[in-house]
Each structure stands twice: as C-alpha cells, then as structure tokens.
UniProtKB/Swiss-Prot annotation:
NCBIfam families: IMP_synth_hisH. The active site is at residues 79, 187, 189. Transmembrane segments: none annotated. This is Imidazole glycerol phosphate synthase subunit HisH. PANTHER family: IMIDAZOLE GLYCEROL PHOSPHATE SYNTHASE SUBUNIT HISH. The keyword Ligase does not apply. It comes from Desulfovibrio desulfuricans (strain ATCC 27774 / DSM 6949 / MB). Heterodimer of HisH and HisF. One of its GO terms (biological process) is L-histidine biosynthetic process.
C-alpha cells in the first residue's frame, strides 16, 4: 500500500485517482502509523511553502516525513512536496524540511523562451524532460514524453542529485533524488500515460523493496 500524505495542500485526490486507475492500493492519510506501515509514501501538494510548512508542523507530519526518510522508506515528492523537501524557499522566505540539500527559487520576471517569445510566470502547461542520470522512475517511458507543470518556483538541489532538467525561460531541475527518495516538479498524476508509468514504476520499486526487506529478516 502507498500512503498519500494529507496535509490540506491540494492534489491528494488526483494522485489517489491516478493510482487507483493503475490498480495500486493506496490511502490518503495524516496518520504517522499508516505512513510507517506503508510500502512507500507520496508527498504531493500545491500552494505556498510557508503555509504548507505550518500545516505540516501543526499535524506533526514534518517529523513524520523525517522519520520516513531516515527509515529509508521510498518517498516521492510532487510539485510543492518536491520544493519543500529542500532546506529553504524564496516563497515566504520559508525554512523548509531540509531532508534534501538545496533551495527553491522564484522564476525571474520577464523571462524569454529560446525563440524569443515571452515565458510568463507561472510556468503552466506541458514540457519535456532532459535526462541527466539514469532513474528507475523513467524506465519504459519515451524520452520525448511531456509532463504537466504548474509552478512559479524551481528547485536547486545538490547537483549530484539532479536526474532530469526542463527548459522554460531557464533550464531548471525537474526531477531529483536517489536511493528511493525522489521528487518531481511536474505533476505525474496529471501527465497522462507517461505520468502513470512513472507512478507505476514508483510502486513497483516500493513493492520490490518491501519484498527484499522481508526476505532479509
């Protein structure tokens, strides 16, 4: 079972529907015990970093996420979740979770696309990924696939963690992580077949990791 973290920040239901479409057992929860028992955790979200951090702290879920990371449970951050796994955000000058080294910055005003046309903020719509390093989440997905983005801020994790980049006004990290902890700036649950395949790959990684842990006992 995958746990979808519920901290009143938006798109948990769309993630659940995507997983249910795949036949993946899942539950939306704010219960730390359910997080601990899950094969993996999805940390989605839309909204502002400061408000999200307040909501996490009020529910004790900031500590729960740190426990998930320390236990080595598979974890997937999506959009706002991707951003606040880092140490800080320029949005609300927020101190964020600090599970992953890096910062979140706002897109510059008056950006331009490569063809000279305006690149308004927020970045909203479909865009592709440029793979930087191999990632099991992208297995079986056409490299030309596009994913759905909605964001005004972009992430700058430790460069060694960058798995894919996207270009919109500037080139930014759109997928980062390693060893079962990943984060996507785009919305896989809203990205059609490529996004569903990514979520399915995450579940398969979680399932195999759980089986390996049981066999090791």
């Amino acid at each position: 079972m995958l746990a979808i973290l519920d901290y009143k920040a938006g798109n948990q239901t769309s993630v659940r529907r995507a997983l249910e479409h795949l036949g993946v057992p899942c539950a939306i929860t704010a219960d730390p015990a359910m997080l601990e028992s899950a094969a993996g955790v999805i940390f989605p979200g839309v909204g502002a970093a400061g408000q999200a951090m307040s909501a996490l702290a009020e529910a004790g879920l900031d500590k729960a996420l740190h426990h998930v990371a320390r236990r080595g449970q598979p974890l997937l951050g999506i959009c706002l979740g991707c951003q606040i796994l880092l140490e800080s955000s320029e949005e609300n000058a927020a101190k964020t979770l600090g599970i992953v080294p890096g910062v979140c910055r706002r897109f510059e005003d008056h950006m331009r696309q490569e063809d000279g046309s305006a690149a308004p903020v927020p970045h909203m719509g479909w865009n592709s990924l440029e793979a930087v390093a191999p990632c099991v989440l992208l297995d079986g997905i056409d490299p030309a696939s596009e994913y759905y983005f909605v964001h005004s801020y972009y992430v700058e994790p430790d460069p060694s963690l960058v798995l894919a980049t996207t270009t919109y006004g500037r080139t930014f990290c759109s997928l980062y992580g390693r060893d079962g902890l990943w984060a996507a700036q785009f919305h896989p649950e809203k990205s059609g077949r490529p996004g569903l395949r990514l979520l399915g790959n995450f579940y398969e990684y979680c399932r195999q990791s759980r089986q390996e842990a049981r066999h090791a006992q």
